[in-house]
Amino acid sequence: MVASVSQQALGPSAGPIVSRAFDAKPPTAEREIDRKLGRLHDHAREFARLGIGKKIELLRDIQQRTLQVAEEWVRAACRAKGLSMDDPVSGEEWIAGPALTLRNIRFLIRALGEIQTRGAPVIADKKVRDLSHGAVAIEVAPYDAFDAALYGGITAETWLQQGIDRGAIEGHQASFFRKSDPQGGVSLVLGAGNVASIPPMDVLYKMFVDGNVCILKMNPVNEYLGPFFERAFKTLVDKGYLEVVYGGGEVGAYLSQHDGVDDIHITGSDKTHDLIVWGPPGPERDDRKRRNDPVLKKPITSELGNVSPVLIVPGPYNDVELRSMAENVAGMVCNNGSFNCNAAKMLVVPKGWKQRDAFVQQLSNVLAKVPPRNAYYPGAFQRYESLTSGHSDVRKIGQGNDRVLPWTLVLGLDGKDESERNFYTEPFCSILSEVSIGSDDPVAFVKEATAFANDRLWGTLSAMLFVHPTVEADAGGKTAVEAAIRDLRYGTVAVNVWPALAYALCSTPWGGHPSATLADIQSGLGWVHNTVMLEDIEKCVVRSKLVPTPKHVYFPGHKSVHRLGRRLVGFEAEPSWLKVPGLAVAALTG
């Protein structure tokens, strides 16, 4: 049976409803919400003051229960998205669902243990680097010896805001655990509908980093996951520390304005955020923004999407490198059917780049081998039509139908056209656009591309640069690239790798750049994951080799990513060196 769902239930910016592979849950009644919030309020102070050892016990309990529901969870997600459990692409659901949730739990257990013994998550002095602009960078990945073995080619740093020196780091870390008399509070988490690990990981952050109890409202798009989360977090529910509710925009609005909610975290769209914070569009909202008088009178943090740029710095790329870059970009586009806030959405290439046509052909060849996916997220077909119509060079790759959208390149946009909607509209569907700017001089291009990404593209979540080793080896090139990493106003800046790794590594912070404001929210404010519990963060910087060996698991065509994903779930639940060879074999046979 496929249940019908009203447009209103999904919220104001959801778009048309796609057919469902699951029965819709009835919205939680207001009186039941009142009861749940009252119960949470009664236990908020108790949870805030719970000993660290007790919180570690709770996390270990969640860890085991998450492992127990993992296969059912993945099966439900695959069914909803039209995937076969036997298809390698189902590995996306293993990895982006229970595996990352378990990794987050594992790192939180370590962090709490270090707080218990040392007062804060441990940061070795050798992991701290002074930056030229008066800030510090803390290496947070590899986070442990397992990370070094499994992801040795990837490094990540958390950059703190300018003016915080290495001697002051501990004062900008784990502040909740420095409180002598915490009162706690009730946090509302408005769950995302696209990636299965987002709701539970947002809950974990609000509870075990911020110290609040939580009410999680499931998104109607993936509300089928709610019962698995309730089972995985059962002990928290039983103790009055967590509640899960269901419904669309009306339930979200009721919760957001409820006196029993102290603060809010939302993963969704900027339109939904502004509706909550400023009220419906119109003169009254505009006036409220001018007066800085939001309707919402409580704190809100958010992660709201992006027109994610990929900047290709010119360099002497050979055929192997161009092929790897094409696979990299295709993976960033195709993962989860392109319904990711960090999916590659705007190629920014040098004007006059001699390898441009060869790269586009390589990318087209890779995409042609990836079967198009169900466009399961509401509004995808309408956004697709809006962002492809009126453009002169639109290349559709693969066949679409009433459920499937083809991978699509929208090429040759005019970088000077301030009205170009692809620059300010997040596609959240299978589109990748391209624009040529600047020149084919690496130093000049990097400077112009940074300004273009900052000033012309919507969003502040994540950006990526492809950089050839010879450019980094050149003093002028390296200086220009490092300046771009510093100056790009994005919460994550990645070199040669998908910025989504900052989401997946968990020791890294994930969120929009802090330059946003409540009135101009861009990709949101605040951070999640961040198991090192750093505060006053500027951004995360992730780096990898131009041609990774083995290939990153998100590259299309990996033949064993479903087996790798299943093994990762078991590993993250109970890590052991005995499990590493099996993971390596699964990765290498892709």
Segment roles from a protein language model:
Residues G315, N335, C341, V349-L461, ...:
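NAD(P)-dependent aldehyde/semialdehyde dehydrogenase
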Residues E57, D402, V446-K559:
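C-terminal core of ALDH-fold dehydrogenases
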Residues D210-V221, Y241, L296-G315, V329, ...:
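Short loop-to-beta-strand entry elements in the cores of soluble alpha/beta enzymes
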Residues V186, P220, T235-M346, K351, ...:
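Conserved NAD(P)+-binding/catalytic subdomain of aldehyde/semialdehyde dehydrogenases
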Residues V2-H172, M218-E223, A232-V237, P581, ...:
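N-terminal Rossmann-like NAD(P)+-binding subdomain of aldehyde/semialdehyde dehydrogenases
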Residues I198-E250:
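PLP-dependent aminotransferase-like
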Residues L50, E57, S84, T272, ...:
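Catalytic cores of nucleotide-enabled group-transfer and carboxylate-activating enzymes in metabolic
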Residues G153-S197, M201, F208-D210:
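Active-site-adjacent "gating/activation" loops or surface patches in catalytic cores
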